[in-house]
Amino acid sequence: DLHKTISKLKTKKLTHLFVFIFSLSLQKLSQSVMNWKQLISNKRFGLEALHEIRKEDRTEFQRDYDRLIFSAPFRRLQNKTQVFPLPGSIFVHNRLTHSLEVSCVGRSLGNDIAASLLQKHPELSDSHLSEIGAIVSAACLAHDLGNPPFGHSGEKAIGTYFSEGKGLALKPLLSEAEWEDLTHFEGNANAFRLLTHQFEGRRPGGFVMTYSTLASIVKYPFSSRLAGKKQKFGFFLSEEEDYKRIAEELGIIKLSKDGEPIRYARHPLVYLVEAADDICYQMMDIEDAHKLKILTTQETKELYLQFFTESRLKRINEICKLVADTNEQIAYLRTSAIGVLIKACTQVFVDNEEDILNGTFEGPLIKHMDKPIRQAYENCSKTAFAKIYCSKDVLDIELAGYQVITTLIDLMIEAVRYPDKAYSKLLINRVSKQYEVHAPTLYGKIQAVLDYISGMTDVYALDLYRKINGNSLPAV
């Protein structure tokens, strides 16, 4: 009897132990898979305590879109360089037209994927899954808001001012994390700051966007300490806690351990924002290069025609014969190629939904397309790097951008560090009150300078540079 009792107790303990281990495993598993119901939230950042469900024609995500369209930072994109110099007699893309086109493609991707997912998961019909298109569309509008003047060369100019220029002298005065933010300055991280930071005199939560829209623009969900050679990261040290709050609310998987620089998996909709951007900049840069005669008509047609199957080519060629205008032919081919890419990226997302939700999917959707379409896209990329991004006009913009931005940063940082100097007072008086140039820390002061300069248009930055150098005076 004693042996039987001991045996029963052992069995009972083992059963309890097994149940405990099994429950822990289930808990870990549930934490390592994101779910759509939690990922799509219309809660507004900064107004959580006042969250209410409004029964009106516009959804919260459509409100995000409208809020961005009517904002001053969005309007300023019309005077910021995309790739080519801002238009003379030939109109090419600027940041505003690019963002609007990315938003359209993002909406198409989102709507197509929402329809496929609802068919695949009918149990989610009562969720916000059908609104993916609206979320992605709004996030696409916002994706370039943080970019400084003069295109990507503006980003490089800010980073290299601190890593190679006069700003290097400030390194001993800043923490390692603060220094990484400055030397790896990133437009995506700056967009997240612009949308969430409470600037002087503004309401808490910045733009007060929905959690899902904000999460969808964070392409690199980790801190600057993990930026590496690609110089990419998703949020500055000052907004790290804000992103953590959003990630936890939406159930985004945390990949870093306690004590390590933070890293999260991407919100699934980031892949759609990224794909829309990849599709638009590549396809539109080719068309712009044709308008500027950097690429011949034959070269341009050959690049676009690679995207179509033989059966589709027959119809494409028939339609092109009906159009006499060469630019219209190119526009039609570009539109058709974008359609092919949207369909291909939609298929990749739906096929890899499980890996995307558990945070193991790697690379952009573009890299996972079927080989013929992927090869056609890569051929466009190779041509762009060989002939477009190294063209004289593009390089001239980079050279001018470096000079203008580094000069402005140098003078403004000197001014906020020594605000009692006479010249410093003149410079600081030009800065809008919303920028915290009198912040208590050096990091805060530098961020205020970068907020001010990154918000400038190309024309404003150039005009200020000329005035500071005495090359331009206001009309009397």
Predicted regions and their residues:
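Long, amphipathic alpha-helical stalk/connector segments used for oligomerization, subunit docking
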Residues: I319-M369
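Aromatic (phenylalanine/tyrosine) cluster motif
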Residues: F18-F22
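Acidic, low-complexity proline/glycine-rich segments
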Residues: R63-R75, M369-I373
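Substrate-recognition/cap regions that form aromatic- and gly/pro-loop-enriched pockets
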Residues: V350-S432
